[in-house]
């Protein structure tokens, strides 16, 4: 029974292997790959830039970052005032 099922499957697999790749799967030639390389690199750079900007904005909008930034600003202003009153 197993041989009865395995033999047609084996024939189909061998036929597919001998047929070769489909036209859509064929590898592009080297010159066309090199021509499209600058466009692909530019697209990759733009995508990377967008993701980096989004990540930076996300970090800027986090509550802990806002609180930390405010604390540093307040502390710096207090130090400036103390220096002004001390040396004025």
UniProtKB/Swiss-Prot annotation:
One of the record's GO cellular component terms: very-low-density lipoprotein particle
Keyword terms, alphabetized: Lipid transport, Secreted, Signal, Transport, VLDL
GO molecular function terms attached to this record: fatty acid binding; lipase inhibitor activity; phospholipase inhibitor activity
Compartments, as annotated in UniProt: Secreted
GO biological process: cholesterol efflux; cholesterol metabolic process; chylomicron remnant clearance; lipoprotein metabolic process; negative regulation of cholesterol transport; negative regulation of fatty acid biosynthetic process; negative regulation of lipid catabolic process; negative regulation of lipid metabolic process
InterPro entries in the record: ApoC-1_sf, ApoC-I
Function, as annotated: Inhibitor of lipoprotein binding to the low density lipoprotein (LDL) receptor, LDL receptor-related protein, and very low density lipoprotein (VLDL) receptor. Associates with high density lipoproteins (HDL) and the triacylglycerol-rich lipoproteins in the plasma and makes up about 10% of the protein of the VLDL and 2% of that of HDL. Appears to interfere directly with fatty acid uptake and is also the major plasma inhibitor of cholesteryl ester transfer protein (CETP). Binds free fatty acids and reduces their intracellular esterification.
Family, per entry: Belongs to the apolipoprotein C1 family.
Protein name: Apolipoprotein C-I
Species of the source: Rattus norvegicus (Rat)
High-level lineage: Eukaryota, Metazoa, Chordata, Craniata, Vertebrata
Gene behind the chain: Apoc1
């Amino acid at each position: 029974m197993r041989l009865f099922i395995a033999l047609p499957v084996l024939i189909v697999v061998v036929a597919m292997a001998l047929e070769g790749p489909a036209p859509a799967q064929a590898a592009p030639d080297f010159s066309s790959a090199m021509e499209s390389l600058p466009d692909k690199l530019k697209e990759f750079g733009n995508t990377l830039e967008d993701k980096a900007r989004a990540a930076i904005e996300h970090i800027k909008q986090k509550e802990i970052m806002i609180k930390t930034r405010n604390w540093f600003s307040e502390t710096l202003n207090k130090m400036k005032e103390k220096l002004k009153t001390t040396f004025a």
